[in-house]
Amino acid sequence: MHCLSVFVILLLLTASAPSVDAQPKTEDDVPLSSFHDDLQRTVRTLLDIRMCCLGTSGCCPWG
């Protein structure tokens, strides 16, 4: 029974260890920061359009 508890503890420790990406990066890989930047740019653009629609007549792209 003692061996089982040691095995479970070792299993939990190895499961929580940081994993290493064994595959080399290719040129198709896009860093996550790029997606984050795209999201921020999209939100900023939508907010700019919203403020433009509220402040100026004829500025809103959808009428």
Swiss-Prot record:
Q: Which InterPro entries match?
A: T-conotoxin
| Key words, A-Z | Amidation, Disulfide bond, Neurotoxin, Secreted, Signal, Toxin
Question: Where would one find the signal peptide in this protein?
Answer: 1-22
Membrane as UniProt keyword: no
Q: Which tissues show it?
A: Expressed by the venom duct.
- Reply yes or no: does the keyword Signal apply: yes
Instruction: Give the comment on domains.
Output: The cysteine framework is V (CC-CC).
Official protein name in the record: Conotoxin PnMRCL-0111
- Provide the species name: Conus pennaceus
Taxonomic lineage is: Eukaryota, Metazoa, Spiralia, Lophotrochozoa, Mollusca
